[in-house]
Amino acid sequence: YKRCHKKEGHCFPKTVICLPPSSDFGKMDCRWKWKCCKKGSVN
């Protein structure tokens, strides 16, 4: 995400981004982050 943000900046509004479980708890890692702007995006 950092790499994408550095290249293309942030979009509004914030959105919940869920990552695959990085631990043995098996829960999705969901946190509020800025949407990532893709080049050519209409948003």
From Swiss-Prot:
Expressing tissues: Expressed by the venom gland.
Disulphide-bridged cysteine pairs: C4-C36, C11-C30, C18-C37
Principal cellular location given in the protein's record: secreted
An individual GO BP term: envenomation resulting in occlusion of the pore of voltage-gated potassium channel in another organism
Compartments, as annotated in UniProt: Secreted
GO cellular component, one term: extracellular region
Entry keywords, A to Z: Antimicrobial, Disulfide bond, Ion channel impairing toxin, Myotoxin, Neurotoxin, Potassium channel impairing toxin, Secreted, Toxin, Voltage-gated potassium channel impairing toxin
A Pfam family reported for this protein in Swiss-Prot or TrEMBL: Myotoxins
Any GO MF annotation of the entry: potassium channel regulator activity
Record bears the keyword Glycoprotein: no
Subunit: Monomer.
Recorded family membership: Belongs to the crotamine-myotoxin family.
Protein role: Cationic peptide that possesses multiple functions. It acts as a cell-penetrating peptide (CPP), and as a potent voltage-gated potassium channel (Kv) inhibitor. It exhibits antimicrobial activities, hind limb paralysis, and severe muscle necrosis by a non-enzymatic mechanism.
Protein name in the entry: Myotoxin-1
Annotated source species: Crotalus concolor
